[in-house]
A protein has these predicted regions:
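Juxta-kinase regulatory segment immediately upstream of eukaryotic protein kinase catalytic domains
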Residues: 1-35, 227-237
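ATP-binding glycine-rich loop module of kinase domains
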Residues: 33-37, 41-83
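Active-site ExK catalytic segment of metal-dependent nucleases
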Residues: 56-63, 122-124, 168-170
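Conserved structural core of kinase catalytic domains
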Residues: 76-81, 91, 97-135
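Protein kinase catalytic-loop region centered on the HRD/HxD motif
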Residues: 141-147
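Catalytic-loop of the protein kinase fold
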Residues: 147-154
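C-lobe/activation-segment region of protein kinase-like
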Residues: 148, 163-238
Length: 238
């Protein structure tokens, strides 16, 4: 059962009271930061240690700084809590143990909108061999259970001889058709695995996903995205 605890203006969510207490440690800054993997306007990701146990800590910042996304958090759980709930359900109900397990979500709201969120998940101690074919197979497995990744690039997968782990996903369910499945696979094929043998039948959803991918790669669209990125780095909230 999902637990919720209020603490110093924050809402802590976990499936075990142990991680509620870990959340209090994080809010009180009672942890050691071992490595910072990413620190941008969009995300903060680091390895932290509490009571000699290491975790991956992530702050998804986009929903707090981009006005339209922040507004819609009035009606949504937010990325941290969604990740906690969805991934744990996928692991327990569909036996998708390849997902890196999240333990805790921290959410703070102001005027009903999220102004801060974070979550922690297990630290994966595997040296990846970056096996692209294994990544395709595990992606097909989550698609067969009705889930999609949403950011299907090799850095979000850890592969080894005996184990595969999936990172950085909210484990959302696909809607009507398999558009999201095609989009996941096309992302990898176009960006990092051009020689891939395409694993799905090319139906109407394939061509829709392909059209969207090609549109996003148009030069003027990429220039707009790059301009927005630079403005965000300067503090613009767009």
């Amino acid at each position: 059962m999902l637990l919720e605890k209020k603490y110093k203006g924050y809402s802590l969510f976990a499936y075990d009271n142990f991680f509620i207490e870990i959340g209090k440690n994080i809010i009180d800054k009672e942890y050691k930061e071992l490595n910072i993997f990413k620190n941008t306007k969009r995300n903060y990701v680091s390895e932290i240690q509490i009571n000699n146990i290491s975790y991956i800590f992530k702050e998804p910042r986009n929903e707090c700084i981009i006005p339209q996304r922040k507004f819609f958090t009035l009606f949504k759980k937010g990325e941290a809590l969604t990740t906690l709930i969805n991934v744990n359900q996928a692991i327990s109900e569909d036996n998708l143990t390849e997902y890196a397990k999240p333990f805790l979500a921290i959410v703070k709201r102001k005027n009903g909108m999220i102004c801060y969120s974070a979550f922690i998940q297990e630290k994966i101690n595997i040296e990846t061999d970056r096996n692209l074919d294994k990544m395709i197979e595990i992606t097909k497995k989550i698609h067969s259970k009705g889930y999609y990744h949403g950011d299907r690039n090799p850095s979000n997968f850890i592969t080894s001889k005996d184990e595969i782990k999936i990172l950085d996903t909210q484990a959302k369910k696909m809607g009507f058709g398999n558009y999201r499945a095609h989009y996941d696979i096309l992302t990898m094929k176009m960006d990092s695995y051009q020689d891939m043998r395409y694993p799905y039948k090319k139906n109407i959803f394939y061509y829709l996903a392909l059209s969207v991918k090609k549109f996003k790669k148009l030069k003027f669209i990429e220039k707009i995205k790059e301009k927005k990125k630079k403005l965000r780095e300067k503090g613009w909230k767009i």
